[in-house]
From Swiss-Prot:
GO terms for molecular function: calmodulin binding. Residues 561-573 have a biased composition (Polar residues). Signal peptide: none annotated. Keywords: Calmodulin-binding, Membrane, Pathogenesis-related protein, Plant defense, Transmembrane, Transmembrane helix. It is a multi-pass membrane protein. The lineage of its organism: Eukaryota, Viridiplantae, Streptophyta, Embryophyta, Tracheophyta. Residues 1-19, 91-163, 393-411 are extracellular. PANTHER family: MLO-LIKE PROTEIN 1, MLO-LIKE PROTEIN 11. Residues 500-532, 554-573 are annotated as: Disordered. Residues 507-516 have a biased composition (Low complexity). It comes from Arabidopsis thaliana. This is MLO-like protein 11. The keyword DNA damage does not apply.
């Protein structure tokens, strides 16, 4: 009897409610939770304030998306806590619970209960959490299901799912921050190449020297300048595949792609391509930090098909590494293709300069690679979160982690794939995807984009309030002059147009926005072999239209500028 009473008192102490708990213990626990929550909240607030002050709007948007993700996971957690007792009291016939859709067999669970394998966990875990299998037996007493029926999901199962959501949130946010940090560090290491390239901003080099620099390609191209291996497609892919494990981008690659981008979009040689690339990557980063609906669907599908004998965790560890290698090889292949075309080793009639185009990418969509990178990063964080969850909730020797060598292999693949994707693939993507047909929205200074958005909002607001008909046009009696060269020092000079220009605008029903370059000083005298001097930033005219507003960007009518995918389609009123 004494031993039975002692066990009963121990069980009662484990299940003690707040009414029987000392007030000091409750106050201490509450204080710890409040202090930790306030520290996290204030840290996020100060980070948001710093991003706003430094005008890093893309990074601020990415942080807001991470906060939305945490809020969503917090809402799911709160919903599970509030409805756990109700769900646990939903009873279904025991015949529905067969061994077909179980991740572990009942015999394995029984062996773990008998051997007490979970008791071998470290002292910290035992002191912080109740024994998981012992509580599983205690929960049976709480259910109200009759004989022959079982809870739809047990109370303990809902608690375990609750903890998985918490681990998933922490792991995904941590992986996202590390990914951006490693990518920024890698891209900033290219800054010295940008500074060297801008030494020729006055366009003073001779044609022979410039042609030598322009044709100075990667070691890959230099190795394949002799036929017939230069046109061997299989050898090119094999070389690109192995090159991503070393120095994925060297100086000649960067200078060549930079020159190709500047020439293709008619920018001056002094344009800061490196800063534009960082702005572009920051804007795209907000697309890879969140968890979209399809990714949540992947989590649900994994929970459904993770049955005994499927080895699903092994396959989900293989998928992200495979995708990282494929994406990295494809990006290297784009560089190799452009370099070979420039060296005259392919049949593509590219002439003497690079021809960036969407056809170089899969399905003519460079943005498809970003979606794959998003899936890779989420998959890696999900793999690590699953490991921590299994080890925390079921023990290191449970049926989920029984094969230790396979667990080590999965973790090694996950860390290697994450590092390769963050430090090599993502920076390479930021550079190579600039070789698409269209430039990205980051090329346009922020103030001009805000001005265009403001006009669009004003138009929609006036139409919504019926201030003018559908055939009306929003007119601005000013001309905006800006330079794309100095992003951090943008100047919007507003000048009045002449009466004749106003009359023409009213007749044509258009609003004109002129982008004129700041003429650079020519500190050297051009000779017969030097190329053009003082090339304007935007040569062709570009029209941005909507059903009610037409905006024209005009400069010298020389070549046709490719339309950015971020701009609406052209439509004349």
């Amino acid at each position: 009897m004494g031993e039975g009473e002692e066990n009963g008192n121990e069980a009662d102490s484990n299940e003690r409610s707040l009414a029987l708990s000392p007030t000091w213990s409750v106050a201490i626990v509450l204080t710890v939770f409040v202090v930790v929550s306030l520290i996290v909240e204030r840290s996020i607030y100060r980070l948001s304030t710093w991003l706003r002050k430094t005008k890093r709007k893309p990074m601020f948007a990415a942080l807001e998306k991470m906060k939305e993700e945490l809020m969503l996971l917090g809402f799911i957690s709160l919903l599970l806590t509030a409805t756990s007792s109700t769900i646990a009291n939903i009873c279904v016939p025991s015949s529905f619970y067969n061994d077909r859709f179980l991740p572990c067999t009942r015999s394995e669970i029984q062996e773990e209960l008998e051997s007490g394998s979970t008791v071998k966990r470290n002292l910290l875990t035992k002191s912080l959490f109740f024994n998981i299998f012992r509580r599983r037996l205690d929960v049976i007493k709480r259910t109200t299901c009759s004989e022959g029926h079982e809870p739809f999901v047990s109370y303990e199962g809902l608690e375990q799912l609750h903890r998985f959501i918490f681990i998933m949130a922490v792991t995904h946010v941590t992986y996202s921050c590390l990914t951006m940090l490693l990518a920024i560090v890698k891209i900033h290491s290219w800054r010295i190449w940008e500074d060297v390239a801008r030494l020729d901003r006055h366009d003073c080099l001779t044609a022979v020297a410039r042609e030598k620099i322009f044709r100075r390609q990667t070691t890959f191209v230099q190795y394949h300048t002799s036929a017939p291996l230069a046109k061997n497609r299989i050898l090119i892919w094999v070389t690109c595949f192995f090159r991503q494990f070393g120095r994925s981008v060297d100086r000649s690659d960067y200078l060549t792609l930079r020159k190709g981008f500047i020439v293709n979009h008619h920018l001056t040689l002094k344009y800061d391509f490196h800063s534009y690339m960082i702005r572009s990557m920051e804007e795209e980063f907000q697309r890879i930090v969140g968890v979209s609906g399809p990714l949540w669907g992947f989590v649900v599908a994994f929970m459904l098909f993770n049955i005994k004998g499927s080895n699903l965790y092994f396959w989900i560890a293989i998928i992200p590494v495979t995708l990282v290698l494929l994406v990295g090889a494809k990006l290297q292949h784009v560089i190799a293709t452009l370099a070979l075309e420039n060296a005259g080793l392919t049949e593509y009639p590219s002439g003497v300069k690079l021809r960036p185009r969407d056809e170089l990418f899969w399905f003519n969509k460079p943005e498809l690679l970003l979606s794959l990178i998003h899936f890779i990063l989420f998959q890696n964080s999900f793999e690590l979160a699953s490991f921590f969850w299994f080890w925390w909730q079921f023990g290191y020797s449970s049926c989920f982690l029984k094969n230790h060598y396979l667990v080590y292999f999965r973790l090694l693949l996950g860390f290697a794939g994450q590092f390769l994707c963050s430090y090599s693939t993502l920076p390479l993507y930021a550079l190579v995807t600039q070789m698409g047909t269209n430039y990205k929205a980051a090329l346009i200074p922020q103030r001009i984009r805000e001005t265009i958005r403001g006009w669009g909002k004003a138009t929609r607001r006036k139409r919504r309030h019926g201030l003018y008909g559908d055939d009306s046009t929003v007119r601005t009696e000013t001309s905006t002059i800006a330079s794309l060269e100095e992003y951090d020092h943008q100047v919007l000079d507003v000048t009045e147009t002449s009466f004749e220009q106003q009359r023409k605008q009213q007749e044509q029903g258009t609003t004109e926005l002129e982008l004129q370059p700041i003429q650079p000083r020519n500190d050297c005298v051009p000779n017969d072999t030097s190329s053009r001097v003082g090339t304007p930033l935007l040569r062709p005219w570009l029209s941005i239209s909507s059903p009610t507003t037409t905006i024209e960007l005009r400069s010298e009518p020389m070549e046709t500028l490719s339309r950015s995918s971020s701009l609406p389609s052209e439509k004349r009123v």
